[in-house]
C-alpha cells in the first residue's frame, strides 16, 4: 500500500518515489513484522519459516548459521526447528515468528498484538525478548490492548474512535 496523502520516508528514502520492487527490498531489509496470529507457513518447518525471508532478500539459503542462532536465541532447539507450525505450542510459534522477523536484521519491528494469543507466562517471556531487542537498538512499534504489555513502552499513543486521544 502507498500513503493516500503526505510522504513516508524510511531509511532516508521517500517511499512515494519508489517502485514496487524497491519497496519490497526496503521492507525485506528494514522492517520485521510480528503478527498476532503468527502467519507461519503451514507446510514449512520452523527453520524454513525463519529462513524464507532470508532467501527472499539474499536469493540463497542461509549458510551463515543466522537462522539456527536466532531460533536458539528464542529457545527453539534443532529438534523443534524441524517441526511444522501445527506441531508447536502457541508460545513456540510466536518465538519462531519473532526469529523470522529478525532474520534480515531489520532496524524496525512492527508488532501487532504480539502476546494476544498467549498465556500470561508466555506473554511475559515474549515481552522480555522484545524489551531486550529494544535495549539492543531496535525500534519497536507495537499495537496492544493489554495495559500490562503497554508498560514496556517508552511512549504510549492511545487511539480512541479512530483518533489519537
Which residues are covered by each model-predicted region?
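Conserved ABC transporter NBD signature motif
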Residues: 6-14
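Conserved ABC ATPase "signature" region
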Residues: 13-14, 62-79
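Short coil-to-helix segment of the ABC ATPase nucleotide-binding domain corresponding to the Q-loop/switch region
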Residues: 44-51
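Conserved ABC ATPase signature
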Residues: 84-88, 92-94
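Hydrophobic anchor residue at the start of the ABC signature
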Residues: 98
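Conserved catalytic motifs of ABC-family nucleotide-binding domains
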Residues: 105
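Catalytic Walker B motif of ABC-type/P-loop ATPase nucleotide-binding domains
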Residues: 109-112
